[in-house]
């Protein structure tokens, strides 16, 4: 058996080679054009390969060459601001080489080999180090300091020598006593999770600036969430909002089998967006992986693993990373196609039996951890799921729900009513509520959890009353129940609805969320007192302060505005009761 074999059979993205000395998950070059592939099954002397490029024109008898290496990514300065495909080929570099259409078999290194980076060591000769220890820093962008680490698979040893200066990622910057050369970059296999010291309890929320998420269904840093929903319900816009505004320091956005137009929107928008915390371009802390639906299906799986490996790398530096995978359903469809080409026994709806194992393998790499340098870092994974026809009982959604702890259920009916984000507050849930309670009590207000519980109760009551309203109309209800419906409507329209394209309303701080909810509940309390003292419901509905309250979401100076609205509200209710 040699490092070179020949093609025996071609079936779409799956190629069978004979006479190849290969191990599982070795990367191979397939055919005369050297298409990149990965060994996924070995049967006696046959190696079954999934090819990450289009196999049109490949025929039996062509050579297959084994690289002897697993599918790996290059980790080092230059990742941020980059746009990659699923196997870490830099699309901008390939465009300069090839034009708008990339020909097959073309490759380019993930990190630039010519750009020089200013390296400042933080260790000296004679210092003891081991895998994951920071040896120096590079100012990668204006926002992010890149920490250069000893590769994680290096045991405990001593620094022999280390240099300061400007280097490319391939230049040797020092040596260890065990003979290891130190460079600004190292490679890591994408299927192997990077090691950490300890996993921490998820008790710090990831602040997203989206009221329905922060207010009702929060996610913790290092948590996992799923956004299932039918077409046109707002999955991609919700993911993009999270990528833009969540308080993670690094964002990895994976377009996994998404429409080309949606990826174009991201690629066109992100470079012009400003990071609200630093005032620098948002791209300075973002890695984009674009793998559109017309690209070969096998690369979809690779794009998810590539993305999470890059996320873990920045986590190891002590950063909070949020990873958006849009959409994991397309990855599952690719798995189904390759599984059928391999003639494996199909599971439910034709998906392979190992669907749940692959999904959990991916989501379980999320977490808030202590890194080898003793710092806290986190990877928060938010995966969109696109069930056919919006049917969330299908296998991908169900298997995802068993793994993730936050479920943001997008609703087509809400989207049709132009209620965005169209997250159904009755179907969604967050299992991080209890672990985050203390954080909200200490850092926001002891009232936060109480207000949230009251608003959820009102929304539940409204749902029950709506069934009666549809039969007999709202006028047939007692006035206190009419008021319940009205306050719930205010919560829905003022608090839960949010305009992603409005410069003020696109992001809402926790302080503003608290004050908005407080004012709505205060209106409800005044209204109940007024009803009890005989004020008719029609007069309460016509108050000016109620209409003014609806405008607060578009006010940048919300504090002064809400103070005025609350004062007006108090006066109006007093004059109603006096009359």
From Swiss-Prot:
CDD domains: ATP-synt_V_A-type_alpha_C (cd18111), ATP-synt_V_A-type_alpha_N (cd18119), V_A-ATPase_A (cd01134)
Any one GO BP annotation for this protein: proton motive force-driven plasma membrane ATP synthesis
Bridged cysteine pairs (disulfide): none
Cellular localisation: Cell membrane
Subunit details: Has multiple subunits with at least A(3), B(3), C, D, E, F, H, I and proteolipid K(x).
Gene3D superfamilies on file: 2.40.30.20, 2.40.50.100, Bovine Mitochondrial F1-atpase, Atp Synthase Beta Chain, Chain D, domain 3, P-loop containing nucleotide triphosphate hydrolases
The protein's role, per its UniProt record: Component of the A-type ATP synthase that produces ATP from ADP in the presence of a proton gradient across the membrane. The A chain is the catalytic subunit.
Lineage of source species: Archaea, Methanobacteriati, Methanobacteriota, Stenosarchaea group, Methanomicrobia
Pfam families xrefs: ATP-synt_ab (PF00006), ATP-synt_ab_N (PF02874), ATP-synt_ab_Xtn (PF16886), ATP-synt_VA_C (PF22919)
Coarse class of the protein's main subcellular location: membrane
GO CC terms, sorted: plasma membrane; proton-transporting two-sector ATPase complex, catalytic domain
Family: Belongs to the ATPase alpha/beta chains family.
NCBIfam families, A to Z: ATP_syn_A_arch (TIGR01043), PRK04192.1 (NF003220)
PROSITE patterns: ATPASE_ALPHA_BETA (PS00152)
Organism whose genome encodes this protein: Methanocella arvoryzae (strain DSM 22066 / NBRC 105507 / MRE50)
Residues at which ATP binds: 229-236
Record flagged with keyword Cell membrane: yes
UniProt-recorded name of the protein: A-type ATP synthase subunit A
InterPro entries for this protein: ATP-synt_VA_C (IPR055190), ATP-synth_a_Xtn (IPR031686), ATP_synth_asu-like_sf (IPR023366), ATP_synth_asu_arc (IPR005726), ATPase_a/bsu_AS (IPR020003), ATPase_F1/V1/A1_a/bsu_N (IPR004100), ATPase_F1/V1/A1_a/bsu_N_sf (IPR036121), ATPase_F1/V1/A1_a/bsu_nucl-bd (IPR000194)
Reactions performed catalytically: ATP + H2O + 4 H(+)(in) = ADP + phosphate + 5 H(+)(out)
